[in-house]
Amino acid sequence: VILSIFSIINYRHSKSLKDKIIKKCNDDTEIIIHMSDFTGFEWDKCIVYGPSTQTKDICDAFDINYNTYLDLNYGIIFIDNNNVTYEEFFKVSDYDFTNKIPEFIIYPYRQNESTQVKYASFEKNEAEFKCIKKHSDNGYYYRLYPIN
């Protein structure tokens, strides 16, 4: 029974959010994506955060019980009725040492915004992001910025 439940959860989230978004953005240099197009689970809000965010910041700001150590990552947390339903980290250190550029980052602030916040939340119907595909000497990397 436990193996069956694990298999269902693993199947449901078998491909990372990052991989799904990269696949969608792969043919374009810039597109608008809706986060709900990439999720197969219930959620009503997502929280996007940057590397200087502490777990306590998230708990206090959104009144949720969350105990994951965020470290120096970018990431996204999906919430449904104040419960975490899915989370994914985009490590700044997850890069090819020949490339030296993180492959994938979702920023909590708009592109070229003068005030760069540590985290931001987006209701499901407003979770739209501009996905920008950029070329480096050793391949491509992707940057997402909220448009709302």
Predicted regions and their residues:
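A short acidic/small-residue loop/turn micro-motif
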Residues: 87-95
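A short, polar/proline- and glycine-enriched secondary-structure boundary/capping micro-motif
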Residues: 96-100
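Short, structured surface segments that line ligand/substrate-binding pockets
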Residues: 66, 70-83, 88
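Short, surface-exposed beta-strand/loop "edge" segments at domain boundaries and coil↔beta transitions
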Residues: 55-56, 84-86, 139-141, 148
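C-terminal partner/receptor-binding element of secreted or periplasmic proteins
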Residues: 101-148
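N-terminal export/targeting and maturation segments
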Residues: 2-69
